[in-house]
């Protein structure tokens, strides 16, 4: 979904965007070298994503409103001897959450599942599973936002959500549950939820794989409506 007044400026660069992304109002996207946005990305309004030096936004990233992510810095006049002309690739890894009003400098890498608290100004790389805040931003020791969830527990959650989805949307949805798989069936559409990818893939079935968060899509009606139900904060899966 690309909302009102979003501007995408492509200046000889590559622009790539995946599935199930939301870009809110008045956001500016620039691709001079490259700008790559993968799947399940949410970008708040009035944000800036600068791909002048190359910018990669990976799966499941959340970017709060009025945030800016840069990949270049340039000012002053060459004729006067200014040497500030930097373009470096910036990378935001999977499932990073950048809260509102954050600034990310050029050439920065933010590791998997790290979180930038409100108003952070980041000038250095951040490792995976870290929380950072402040200006200049620094890591906050001892603060964790995730807990370990077993694959068995994940399957129970998916079963609970399947049942909830049926009660809200489709009373005639058929749900079949066994130890390793959950099957959803509505008319000719079928979804398989499994811990691991089955050895045999049935054509025209949608598969949600728990172990690697991947899904094999068919773009069926049931797939789209079920994934829309999950997508916000229940579970997200990535299509390759």
Where are these regions (language model features)?
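Contiguous mid-protein beta-loop-alpha structural module that forms a pocket-lining wall or clamp
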Residues: 122-129, 136-140
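Residues that flank catalytic or metal-binding motifs in active/ligand-binding sites
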Residues: 65, 118, 128
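Flexible, glycine/small-residue-enriched loop-and-beta-strand segment within the central core
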Residues: 1-109, 135-136, 141-145
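C-terminal/domain-terminus segments
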Residues: 110-124, 203
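Short, solvent-exposed secondary-structure boundary motifs
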Residues: 58, 111-112, 123, 174-176
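Terminal amphipathic alpha-helical/low-complexity segments used for targeting or macromolecular assembly
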Residues: 135-240
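Hydrophobic/aromatic ligand-binding patch that stacks against planar heteroaromatic rings
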Residues: 60, 113, 131
């Amino acid at each position: 979904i690309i909302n009102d007044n979003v501007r995408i400026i492509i200046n000889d660069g590559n622009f790539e965007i995946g599935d199930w992304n939301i870009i809110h109002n008045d956001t500016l996207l620039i691709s001079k070298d490259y700008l790559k946005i993968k799947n399940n990305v949410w970008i708040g309004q009035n944000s800036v994503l600068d791909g002048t030096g190359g910018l990669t936004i990976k799966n499941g990233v959340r970017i709060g409103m009025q945030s800016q992510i840069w990949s270049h810095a340039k000012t002053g006049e060459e004729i006067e001897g200014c040497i500030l002309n930097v373009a470096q690739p910036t990378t935001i890894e999977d499932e990073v959450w950048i809260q509102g009003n954050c600034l990310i400098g050029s050439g920065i890498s933010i590791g998997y599942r790290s979180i930038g608290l409100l108003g952070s100004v980041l000038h250095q790389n951040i490792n995976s599973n870290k929380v950072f805040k402040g200006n200049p931003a620094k890591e906050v020791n001892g603060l964790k936002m995730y807990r370990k969830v077993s694959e068995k527990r994940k399957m129970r959650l998916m079963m609970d959500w399947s049942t909830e989805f049926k009660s809200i949307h489709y009373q005639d949805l058929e749900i079949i549950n066994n130890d390793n798989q959950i099957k959803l069936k509505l008319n000719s559409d079928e979804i398989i939820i499994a811990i691991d990818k089955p050895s045999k893939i049935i054509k025209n079935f949608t598969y949600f794989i728990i172990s690697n968060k991947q899904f094999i899509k068919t773009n069926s009606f049931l797939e789209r409506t079920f994934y829309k139900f999950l997508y916000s904060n229940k579970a997200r899966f990535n299509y390759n």
